[in-house]
C-alpha cells in the first residue's frame, strides 16, 4: 500500500440530465430515468425473493456491488422495516470504488420523498472517503450497512461472511470491466451458500457465462420498464438458514470502562443478553478521567491498522454525536519543531477528510472533547453493573464459569469478553501498564482544545492539562506532575493562565508492545478487547462492534487484514517466529 491509496477518488457526477446523475468516469446513469426506486424493488428486492427469503430468519445478509447513491440500501431498509422478523438483524455489505459526497447523495435522494426519513438518517452517518469498510448502524431497525470503499476485487478479498443475496448494480459491464471479471464472479460464489440469490439488470452474455462458470444457476427474467430482460441466479442446493450465531446464551463483559461499555452497547442493541461485571463500578478506572480529546491517530502510512484506526475514529465520532458528555469541536495539534511541522503538512495532504494544516497547527475539524464517565455511563444506561472481582474462569458445562477469589462461581455464561483495562494483564500478559496523571486548574480554557505532547481543554471546574506517562503501574509524585504541566503550558501556550489546582486524577492505562489494541478470540469461549492505551474512546466502539458481530455470526466491521493487525495471538506468533529463526541460525 502507498499513502496515495488511503482515500478513494470521489465520484465525478454529471447533473445535466433531468433524469438524475451520471458517472463521468463510466458515462452511465446511477438509476433508471423512468423510476429508479421501483426498478430497484423489481430487479433486486423481488429478484432476490425478498421479503419471503428472510421470513423467520434471525439474521440475514445482503451483499451488493455498486453502492452508488445508496438508493438500493434505502429500498432494502424500507422493506426490512415493513417485514422484519421478530428480533431480526439485517446486514447490508456493499462495495463502492468512487464514493459520493454527502451533498451529492442528498441531491439524488430528493427525487424520492417517500424515503426522506430513511435518507436523512443515512445522510447523518454518511462516511468519509477512507478506503476499507465503513460501518453504519441503525439499531432501532436491526439494520447495519458496511460500505467497502475500494476496488471490487480488493474489497471482496477482505470479506469473510457468507451472503444470502447479491445485488449486482455496477455500471454497464462494457464500461466497467473490473467489476464484472471472472475473478469477481468466482469470489461471489465463494461467499455464497446454498440458496443464495443474485439479481442484476444486465443480460450480457459474458456475465451469464461468468456466473455459470463460478457455479451459479443462471436464468433470464422479464426486465423492468423498457428493458426487455434481466438476470437472476442462484447458488445450487437447498436453501439454508444462514444465521451463524457463534454464541448461544448470555455474554459476560469483564470491565466497565470504555471497552466494556462499548461491548455491552454493541451486544445489547443486537438483542444479546449481557452480564456487565466490574469490582469498582462503571468508569472507575482509566475511563474515569475528568475530560479527554477524541482525535484520529496520526501515522504517516497506508497500512491495514492505519485504515482500521481511522475507521474506528469515524465510527466513534458518529456513535458519540449527541450523547451526554460529548462536545463536537475542532482540536488543534501544535508541532514540536520544524520537522514535525513538515510531517503535519504532509499528513494533511494525505488525510484531507480528517486534517487541515494552517501553517502553524494541525487542525482536526471532526474531532471533539468528552467527559469520559458521562459517555461510559450513557452507553450502559440500560445495563446493570455487577460489582464482583473475578479471580479465575473455567469451562463449565457448555459455557464458562466465573469464580471470585473465594472460589465461588458467581456467574455462568456462554461467553466471556475480557475488557478490564490494566486488570486484563491477569489474562493476557502481553499488556504493558502505563500510569498517568491529569490536573484541573482554575482558569479559562483555550479557545480550542489544544495538544502538543501534553494537552489542554475545558473540564468541569476549569481547564484540564494532561497527561503524564510513566512506565509501570506506579503513579509519580503529584507536585512533580503539576510543575511539569505548568512549565509545558508556559512554553507552548503562554497565553493560557493556570490558577490553583482544583482537582487531580490518576490512573493506569494498558497498552501493547506495538501500541495497537488486542481484539478477538483467546479461546472458543473467551475473547478480549484491551490494550487501548490512551486511545480507548477512539478505538473501542468499532472494535466492540466487530467483536459483537463475530459473536452473533454477522458481517465483520473491519477488513480481514485490519482484524489480523489487532489479533490477540500476534505477539505469541512473533515470538514463535523469532525462536524458529534463532534455532535455524
Swiss-Prot record:
GO biological process per UniProt: methylation; tRNA wobble base modification
Chief localisation class: cytoplasm
Top-level taxonomic group: Bacteria
Keywords: Cytoplasm, FAD, Flavoprotein, Methyltransferase, Multifunctional enzyme, Oxidoreductase, S-adenosyl-L-methionine, Transferase, tRNA processing
Stretch list, region Disordered: 564-585
Chain segments carrying region FAD-dependent cmnm(5)s(2)U34 oxidoreductase: 254-585
Molecular functions per Gene Ontology: flavin adenine dinucleotide binding; oxidoreductase activity, acting on the CH-NH group of donors; tRNA (5-methylaminomethyl-2-thiouridylate)(34)-methyltransferase activity
Pfam families xref list: DAO (PF01266), Methyltransf_30 (PF05430)
Transmembrane segments: none
UniProt subcellular location: Cytoplasm
EC number: 2.1.1.61, 1.5.-.-
One GO CC term, this protein: cytoplasm
Region (tRNA (mnm(5)s(2)U34)-methyltransferase) residue spans: 1-236
Free-text function comment from the UniProt entry: Catalyzes the last two steps in the biosynthesis of 5-methylaminomethyl-2-thiouridine (mnm(5)s(2)U) at the wobble position (U34) in tRNA. Catalyzes the FAD-dependent demodification of cmnm(5)s(2)U34 to nm(5)s(2)U34, followed by the transfer of a methyl group from S-adenosyl-L-methionine to nm(5)s(2)U34, to form mnm(5)s(2)U34.
UniProt family annotation: In the N-terminal section; belongs to the methyltransferase superfamily. tRNA (mnm(5)s(2)U34)-methyltransferase family.
Record-given protein name: tRNA 5-methylaminomethyl-2-thiouridine biosynthesis bifunctional protein MnmC
Protein's organism: Maricaulis maris (strain MCS10)
Phylogenetic lineage: Bacteria, Pseudomonadati, Pseudomonadota, Alphaproteobacteria, Maricaulales
Amino acid at each position: 500500500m502507498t499513502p496515495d491509496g488511503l482515500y478513494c477518488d470521489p465520484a465525478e457526477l454529471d447533473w445535466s440530465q433531468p433524469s438524475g446523475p451520471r458517472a463521468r468516469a463510466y458515462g452511465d446513469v446511477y438509476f433508471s430515468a423512468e423510476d429508479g426506486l421501483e426498478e430497484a424493488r423489481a430487479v433486486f428486492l423481488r429478484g432476490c425473493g425478498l421479503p419471503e427469503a428472510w421470513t423467520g430468519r434471525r439474521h440475514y445478509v445482503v451483499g451488493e456491488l455498486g453502492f452508488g447513491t445508496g438508493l438500493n440500501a434505502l429500498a432494502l431498509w424500507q422493506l426490512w422495516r415493513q417485514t422484519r422478523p421478530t428480533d431480526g438483524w439485517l446486514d447490508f455489505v456493499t462495495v463502492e470504488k468512487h464514493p459520493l459526497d454527502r451533498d451529492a447523495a442528498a441531491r439524488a435522494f430528493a427525487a424520492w420523498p417517500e424515503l426522506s426519513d430513511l435518507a436523512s438518517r443515512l445522510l447523518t452517518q454518511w462516511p468519509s472517503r477512507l478506503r476499507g469498510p465503513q460501518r453504519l448502524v441503525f439499531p432501532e431497525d436491526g439494520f447495519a450497512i458496511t460500505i467497502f470503499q475500494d476496488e471490487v476485487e480488493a474489497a471482496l478479498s477482505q470479506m469473510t461472511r457468507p451472503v444470502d443475496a447479491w445485488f449486482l448494480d455496477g455500471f454497464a459491464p462494457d464500461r466497467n470491466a473490473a467489476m464484472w471479471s471472472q475473478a469477481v464472479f468466482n469470489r461471489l460464489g465463494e461467499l455464497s451458500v446454498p440458496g443464495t440469490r443474485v439479481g442484476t439488470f444486465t443480460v450480457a452474455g459474458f456475465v451469464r457465462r461468468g456466473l455459470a462458470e463460478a457455479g451459479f444457476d443462471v436464468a433470464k427474467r422479464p426486465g423492468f420498464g423498457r428493458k426487455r430482460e434481466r438476470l437472476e441466479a442462484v447458488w445450487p442446493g437447498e436453501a439454508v438458514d444462514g444465521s451463524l450465531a457463534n454464541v448461544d446464551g448470555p455474554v459476560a463483559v469483564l470491565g466497565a470502562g470504555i471497552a466494556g461499555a462499548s461491548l455491552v452497547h454493541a451486544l445489547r442493541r443486537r438483542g444479546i443478553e449481557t452480564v456487565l461485571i466490574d469490582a469498582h463500578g462503571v468508569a472507575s478506572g482509566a475511563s474515569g478521567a475528568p475530560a479527554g480529546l477524541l482525535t484520529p491517530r496520526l501515522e504517516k502510512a497506508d497500512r491495514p491498522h492505519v485504515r482500521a484506526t481511522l475507521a474506528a475514529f469515524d465510527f466513534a465520532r458518529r456513535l458519540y454525536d449527541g450523547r451526554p458528555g460529548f462536545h463536537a469541536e475542532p482540536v488543534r495539534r501544535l508541532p514540536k519543531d520544524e520537522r514535525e511541522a513538515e510531517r503535519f503538512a504532509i499528513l494533511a495532504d494525505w488525510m484531507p477528510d480528517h486534517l487541515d494544516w494552517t501553517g502553524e497547527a494541525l487542525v482536526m475539524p471532526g474531532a471533539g472533547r468528552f467527559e469520559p464517565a458521562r459517555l461510559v455511563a450513557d452507553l450502559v444506561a440500560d445495563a446493570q453493573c455487577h460489582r464482583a472481582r473475578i479471580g479465575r474462569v473455567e469451562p463449565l458445562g457448555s459455557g464458562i464459569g466465573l469464580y471470585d477469589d473465594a472460589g465461588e462461581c458467581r456467574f455462568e455464561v456462554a461467553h466471556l469478553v475480557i475488557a478490564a483495562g490494566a486488570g486484563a494483564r491477569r489474562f493476557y500478559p502481553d499488556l504493558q501498564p502505563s500510569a498517568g496523571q491529569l490536573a484541573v486548574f482554575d482558569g479559562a480554557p483555550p479557545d480550542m482544545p489544544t495538544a502538543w505532547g501534553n494537552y489542554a481543554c475545558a473540564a468541569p471546574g476549569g481547564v484540564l492539562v494532561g497527561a503524564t506517562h510513566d512506565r509501570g503501574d506506579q503513579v509519580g509524585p503529584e507536585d512533580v506532575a503539576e510543575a511539569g504541566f505548568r512549565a509545558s503550558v508556559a512554553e507552548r501556550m503562554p497565553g493560557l493562565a493556570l490558577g490553583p489546582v482544583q482537582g487531580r486524577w490518576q490512573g493506569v492505562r494498558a497498552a501493547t508492545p506495538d501500541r495497537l489494541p488486542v481484539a478477538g478470540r483467546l479461546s472458543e469461549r473467551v475473547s478480549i478487547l484491551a490494550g487501548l492505551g490512551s486511545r480507548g474512546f477512539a478505538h473501542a466502539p468499532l472494535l466492540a462492534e466487530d467483536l459483537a458481530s463475530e459473536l452473533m455470526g454477522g458481517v465483520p466491521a473491519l477488513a480481514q487484514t485490519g482484524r489480523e493487525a489487532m489479533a490477540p495471538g500476534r505477539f505469541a506468533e512473533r515470538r514463535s517466529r523469532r525462536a524458529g529463526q534463532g534455532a535455524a541460525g
